[in-house]
Amino acid sequence: MSRRSISRKPRVLVDTTFLLPALGVEVEEDALKAIALFRKLEIYYLEVGVLEAMWKVLKAIPPEHLEVVKVGLNSIRNTYNTLDIPAEAYTEAYRIYNEGHKDYIDTLYYSTAKTTGTPWLTIDEEFIEFLKQHNYKIEGIIYTPEDLKSIIR
């Protein structure tokens, strides 16, 4: 269920990387700098991104720190908005996966951003290059942290 917002802030779908710090998992400096700008954006996430984040938590967070994870999960859910993945996005993600990018979650993020018109913030340069090489549209669909300052009013 999405939180409704009457703000006119730019909408952005965030990659799993940007959920990880709330769960106690370290990320790249570029991601942390982008997160500092989130208050100026209307942030969306995918539930599959939370699942992907939990796979990283299983590897990085010891059991005695699970309370941090729980607080972080609640924070994500209470602060950001969920974005439902349209059926069309699932099938487009399948096609992209079959073209050679073997991370289905990445392909879901991209296809959801494209289908819903909610740009996707990612630091995954390898996937961006894959999309370019396969003639997928990037402009207006994918943002990198460097792009954020130009879209914030």
Question: Which residue ranges define each predicted feature?
Answer:
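Anionic group-transfer/hydrolysis microenvironments
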Residues: T17, L23, G49, M54, ...
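Short, flexible helix/strand-to-coil boundary loops that buttress conserved ligand/catalytic motifs
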Residues: L23-G24, V57, Y97, L131-K132
